Regions:
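Hydrophobic alpha-helical membrane-insertion segments
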Residues: 34-47, 165-173, 378-390, 468-488
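Membrane-interfacial helical/loop segments at transmembrane boundaries in membrane proteins
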Residues: 58-61, 188-192, 399-413, 486-512
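Hydrophobic alpha-helical transmembrane segments
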Residues: 69-81, 199-211, 415-431, 506-529
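Short phosphate-coordinating micro-motif centered on Lys-Gly-acidic
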Residues: 134
Length: 657
């Protein structure tokens, strides 16, 4: 525990940089981000020691409050530490673009944000958890609202604050109900609660609603595509890579420790919420032209996949299947891998914005010639998010699909097989859409010809940003080629034995035999051999290079696929879900042979926002307007309100004493 406290001490030093004089902004920037980097490195090392070295730190208690670390929290602390190191290194270069714009506040809040996430994972009681959870919410709100002079940023930040407050209220109710049926509010005491059936259902609903909101599951995701693009890119990377996973940690803590006897419908709700979130998330990501909103909706998709795997594990355990641990292993492996690849892609998005001054896909094209290193790193991240074999994205999603296969084959019952078939089909659609989404993302951005002048003036990022993206890219490839450490960490976190070999992994349980076998290094060797044979077969072929016939015209950049045009087949196929709003304006006729010019405007409204949240907002506004009539400014009227309230309380007490 001492090493975790050292990490918290580093973060505390970074927080104090907010107090430095205004003239020391640059020094505050370097000190805060360096402190975050070293603190995250210590955190990752301490978590790794606990997971792989068998070192179990003694819990730290004072009064009714406690800090501790077990296997479930250690794997998330490892994830937080690694992501914190990479993003803090990136921030050393990227955050300098905010010099003169509250740079001290940015660095201090950055350290407070990471520190609060670490303390949430170390919390050993409900009150400590909720305290650090609220600090995490406030720090992330301040970071999202850093450019508060922009109206869109202000709106996104306050919508995030309102939504996260609602989620916190639900989590608080779940803790209070569980603690009231226990001998205390420590996690150890709450694990021995005496909740009966109906109260267990209520605790599950509150806990799932609160953590699903923080994780960005549909239909509670509406804050995420607005808050992540509004925040600075290194903040977006950590919010998507780590903060969303802490919601998974909290939900898992409730399910494993406080509600170990799972009801069948709980499992179905978690599974379906994950599957629907995955499908709708990637569908909307395919439609976006803002690079950060693409990645934000991709986070909705991947959190959906993660919760679907968790629901699959729950359903197998509730059905007494021997393979239930496979779902939870897939959950942790994909959560860890998604954290690394999403951190990488948000950093690449920041590099693109830093080099071009824009985040509009429609203005890019040919950036690989101006930003070659960023292009390579974005290519690696795109392969991973598209779940291409030999990347870490494939490892996690492959395990998820294997867990669903095990669900369908090891559990009896037509209803379970129905859920399995529906989930498998929707996850298949999700994978295909994710592939198309990131082919579009990389191709439109880095390939082809420049679509605007901003590409001509683009420049590569500085050494800190490139180094951070390089480290993340290496981790993506390394965890794809050699997934053993990640899988082993997941199994150790779940308290399960593991059978691994030097070339891949064999997940086995007593009495079952090998459940899953995957050997990426052998697959790589096979691909290299096939590639060499292909090269030998074509190296002596006669190749003619010539200009393609262009119908007598010189092609321009406007004749390339646009981001909107690339996604049109998908948009047409799911028109009934997306409800696109098109506006076509015809201009005057400029040339006799080429006809009129036209202006095409497309808007894809969020279906959940339009059908659910906007009507709710109207009702709340109506109620608020009615309540305003009660505020007349009269002291005598307010005294009368108090008297009426007291009378009602007395009557209630007399009737129900």
């Amino acid at each position: 525990m001492e090493m975790f406290l050292v990490a918290v001490g580093f973060y505390g030093i970074g927080v104090l940089t907010m107090l430095l004089p205004h003239g020391m902004q640059r020094a505050a920037h370097w000190l805060a981000n360096s402190a975050a980097l070293f603190g995250s490195a210590v955190c990752a090392y301490a978590a790794g020691l606990q997971l792989f070295g068998g070192v179990s730190p003694a819990p730290l208690t004072w009064g009714s409050y406690s800090l501790g670390c077990d296997g479930w929290s250690a794997v998330f602390l490892l994830l937080t530490g690694i992501a914190g190191v990479v993003t803090s290194l990136y921030a050393l270069g990227y955050a300098r673009s905010y010099e003169g714009s509250r740079l001290r506040l940015l660095g201090g809040m950055w350290c407070l944000f990471i520190m609060s996430m670490v303390l949430v994972l170390l919390a050993g009681d409900a009150f400590s958890f909720l305290l650090f959870w609220e600090i995490m919410a406030v720090a992330s709100f301040m970071l999202v609202n850093h450019e508060s002079e922009k109206r869109a940023t202000w709106n996104a930040a306050y919508q995030y604050l309102v939504m996260t407050s609602v989620g916190t209220a639900a989590i608080m109710i779940a803790f209070l109900l569980t603690g009231s049926a226990s001998e205390g509010f420590s996690f150890a005491a709450m694990s021995k609660n005496t909740l009966d059936g109906s109260w267990q259902h209520l605790v599950f609903v509150c806990a799932f609603a609160g953590f699903a909101l923080k994780a960005g599951l549909v239909p509670l995701h509406v804050w995420l595509p607005k808050a992540h693009p509004a925040a600075p890119c290194h903040v977006s990377a950590l919010m998507s890579g780590v903060m969303l996973k802490i919601a998974l940690y909290g939900f898992g803590r409730f399910m494993f420790s406080f509600l170990p006897a799972w009801n069948y419908w709980w499992c179905v709700v978690v599974l379906l919420a994950g599957v629907v979130s995955a499908f709708l998330g990637v569908l909307y990501a395919q439609m976006e032209t803002d690079i950060k909103r693409v990645l934000a909706y991709s986070s909705v998709e991947n959190m959906g996949v993660i919760f679907a795997a968790f629901g699959c594990g729950m359903l197998m355990k509730a059905s007494d299947s021997s393979f239930y641990m496979l779902g939870f292993v897939a959950t942790l492996v994909h959560a860890f891998n998604h954290s690394i690849m999403k951190v990488l892609m948000f950093m690449c998005a920041g590099s693109i914005m830093h080099g071009t001054g824009s985040k509009n896909l429609e203005l890019f094209g040919g950036l690989a010639r101006k930003m070659p290193y960023t292009a390579v790193f974005a290519f690696v991240g795109s392969l991973a998010l598209a779940a291409i074999p030999l990347t870490n994205g494939f490892t996690g999603e492959w395990l998820v699909l294997q867990s669903f296969i095990s669900l369908g084959t090891s559990c009896a019952g037509q209803d379970i097989r129905l859920w399995t078939a529906v989930s498998f089909i929707m996850l298949g659609f999700t994978g295909a859409l994710a592939l198309g989404c990131f082919v579009r993302f990389f191709g439109i951005t880095f390939l082809g010809r420049a679509r605007s002048e901003i590409v001509e003036h683009a420049h590569e990022s500085d050494k800190f940003m490139l180094a951070a993206m390089g480290v993340a890219s290496v981790l993506v490839v390394a965890c794809g080629l050699y997934p053993l450490p990640v899988v082993r960490a997941a199994l150790l976190a779940l308290g399960m034995p593991v059978a691994l070999d030097a070339f891949g992994m064999n997940l086995a349980w007593a009495g079952i035999g090998t459940a899953v076998c995957y050997k990426p290094l052998l697959l790589l060797a096979l691909l290299l051999v096939l590639g060499a044979l292909l090269w030998l077969s074509v190296k002596d072929c006669f190749i003619v290079e010539d200009v393609t016939w262009n119908c007598g015209t010189y092609p321009t950049q406007r004749q390339q696929y646009s981001a909107t045009g690339f996604s049109k087949p998908v948009r047409r196929a799911f028109d009934y879900l997306l409800k696109p709003k098109r506006q076509v304006t015809y201009m005057r006729k400029e040339h006799a042979y080429f006809g009129r010019q036209l202006s095409y405007k497309l808007e894809i409204p969020d279906m959940i926002t339009e059908k659910l949240y906007q009507p709710l907002q109207k009702h709340f506004v109506s109620i608020s307007n009615f309540l305003r009539r009660l505020q007349q400014g009269s002291v005598r009227l307010y005294v009368a309100y108090v008297m009426v309230a007291m009378m009602l309380v007395l009557v209630w007490g007399a009737l129900y004493k």
